[in-house]
């Protein structure tokens, strides 16, 4: 880069030079990070560590426990073990008919 005397520059030119330096530093940092992640994935030492979900105060959402797939008795696929209803259907009480 060529030598520039900073004493003779006005504020706008100094801000433009500072902005150019700032953008170059950010681009180099982002590109370096991308290369580090790519190398870690290729070499097999990149892994994501999932933290335990916190309480409601972290995100305002209750943590949901995975209880597995829901199996509805009338929605079984043909050929699956236990095909059909698991229990007998019950009629509703006479006052609701």
From Swiss-Prot:
Q: Name one GO biological process term.
A: regulation of gene expression
GO CC terms on record? cytoplasm
Q: Keywords, A to Z?
A: Chromosomal rearrangement, Cytoplasm, Phosphoprotein
Transmembrane intervals: none
Which disease is this protein implicated in? A chromosomal aberration involving ATXN7L3B has been found in a mother and her two children with varying degrees of neurodevelopmental delay and cerebellar ataxia. One child also exhibits episodes of unresponsiveness suggestive of absence seizures and facial dysmorphism. Deletion at 12q21.1 deletes the entire single exon of ATXN7L3B.
Q: What does this protein do?
A: By binding to ENY2, interferes with the nuclear functions of the deubiquitinase (DUB) module of the SAGA complex which consists of ENY2, ATXN7, ATXN7L3 and the histone deubiquitinating component USP22. Affects USP22 DUB activity toward histones indirectly by changing the subcellular distribution of ENY2 and altering ENY2 availability for ATXN7L3 interaction. Regulates H2B monoubiquitination (H2Bub1) levels through cytoplasmic sequestration of ENY2 resulting in loss of nuclear ENY2-ATXN7L3 association which destabilizes ATXN7L3. Affects protein expression levels of ENY2 and ATXN7L3.
PANTHER family from the xrefs? ATAXIN-7 LIKE PROTEIN 3B, ATXN7L3B, ATAXIN-7-LIKE PROTEIN 3B
Sequence similarity: Belongs to the SGF11 family.
Other comments on record: Encoded by an expressed retrotransposed copy of the ATXN7L3 locus that emerged prior to the speciation event separating primates and rodents.
Q: This protein is called what?
A: Ataxin-7-like protein 3B
Native species: Homo sapiens (Human)
Its gene name is ATXN7L3B
């Amino acid at each position: 880069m060529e030598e520039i005397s900073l004493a003779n520059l006005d504020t706008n030119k100094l801000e433009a030079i500072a902005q150019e330096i700032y953008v170059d530093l950010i681009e180099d940092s982002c590109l370096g990070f991308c290369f580090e992640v790519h190398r870690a994935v290729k070499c097999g030492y990149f892994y994501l560590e999932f933290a335990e979900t916190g309480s409601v105060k972290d995100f305002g959402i209750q943590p949901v426990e995975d209880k597995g797939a829901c199996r509805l008795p009338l929605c079984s696929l043909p050929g699956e073990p236990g095909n059909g209803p698991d229990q007998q259907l019950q009629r509703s009480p006479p006052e609701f008919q």
